[in-house]
């Protein structure tokens, strides 16, 4: 979801990107609100059903007539000794705390996700959110 424009001898991040035919301003990863939810979802069929609803939410999310979730990734957790029973992870990124609050309380697409959660086996969940204080990577 990055847009680059060529400068004289290097590429730089553009402040505008086009997604699904709409021009949107670019918000750096460090300025976003990152929300991570982990689920203890033991049944593979429940994980698959939930994953399908996450895909639908990624496509259908709207606020004021435009998509507002900047990034959404979801999937089963890789098995390992530190998972503490968490089997599924969803990470969303928002431009502001207000967008995240809308997501949690008013978003119809997220409401459909919550309905599915009420119909499948969940043995526990944990949600955290933050604005990055350090970023990096290759």
Curated annotation (Swiss-Prot):
Listed Gene3D superfamilies: 3.30.70.100
Residues covered by the Stress-response A/B barrel domain: 33-130
Alphabetical list of SUPFAM superfamilies matching this protein: Dimeric alpha+beta barrel
Pathway named in the protein's UniProt entry: Secondary metabolite biosynthesis
Any Pfam family the entry gives: Dabb
Protein function: Part of the gene cluster that mediates the biosynthesis of the lipopeptide fusaristatin A. Fusaristatin A consists of a polyketide chain linked to three amino acid residues glutamine (Gln), dehydroalanine (dehydro-Ala), and beta-aminoisobutyric acid. The biosynthesis starts with formation of a linear polyketide chain by the highly reducing polyketide synthase PKS6. The gene cluster does not contain an acyl-CoA ligase or an acyl-transferase, and it is therefore predicted that the polyketide is transferred directly to the nonribosomal peptide synthetase NRPS7.
Protein name: Fusaristatin A biosynthesis cluster protein FGSG_08206
Organism: Gibberella zeae (strain ATCC MYA-4620 / CBS 123657 / FGSC 9075 / NRRL 31084 / PH-1) (Wheat head blight fungus)
């Amino acid at each position: 979801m990055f847009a680059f424009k060529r400068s004289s001898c290097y590429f730089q991040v553009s402040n505008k990107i086009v997604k699904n035919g709409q021009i949107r301003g670019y918000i750096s990863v460090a300025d976003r609100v990152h929300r991570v939810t982990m689920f203890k979802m033991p049944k593979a069929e429940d994980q698959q059903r939930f994953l399908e609803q996450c895909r639908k939410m990624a496509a259908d999310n709207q606020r004021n007539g435009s998509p507002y979730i900047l990034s959404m990734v979801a999937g089963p957790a890789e098995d390992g000794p530190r998972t503490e029973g968490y089997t599924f992870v969803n990470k969303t990124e928002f431009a502001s705390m207000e967008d995240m609050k809308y997501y949690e309380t008013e978003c119809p697409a997220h409401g459909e996700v919550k309905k599915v959660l009420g119909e499948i086996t969940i043995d526990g969940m944990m949600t955290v959110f933050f604005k990055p204080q350090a970023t990096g990577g290759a």
